Amino acid sequence: MKLSLLRHGEPVGGRIYRGNQDDPLTEKGWQQMLDATQNQSWDLIITSPLLRCQSFAQHLHQQQKSSLEIVDNFLELGFGDWQGQSSMQIGQDLVDAFKLSPIENKPPNAEDLYDFQHRVLNAFKIITAKKSNSALIIAHAGVIRVIKSYLLNLPIEKMFTIDVLSASCEEFEI
């Protein structure tokens, strides 16, 4: 199966720890995603239910006439008390500590990283068991980091060493 992982484009509200906050894409975010998927097609499109992913997935689904699945387990990591705040509001030292050691330094009231990994990979394994020639997962940086960590055999504690830019699209053969 050809598997593509696409992070959503720029959302309304700027660079914050958004988590499950349901912000739509900006015009720039839409254009980023159009550019990232230009001249490509997939048999199956899988998306997070959040607007910044699902709205574009619906558009692509209608355009390509491909199958579409909305997967709740592809929601972004819940950032607890950090949700809706920028790195500057949180404190760069706390953000750096979290990225370096996310198990020991998780944000207050945040989702457990192992629970997050478990829910994402459960959904991912169901998807990869499907008989599809090509699939596109439209999701969030955290979800994509978990999947890439799994595919690259990296421990989940190292997921923040993986860069996932807005509207970046990577392809894997699985």
Question: What is the predicted function of each stretch?
Answer:
Residues 152-174:
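Domain-level recognition of soluble alpha/beta enzyme cores
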Residues 47-48, 118, 138-139:
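Short beta-strand scaffold positions
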Residues 3, 131-142:
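Generic beta-sheet signal
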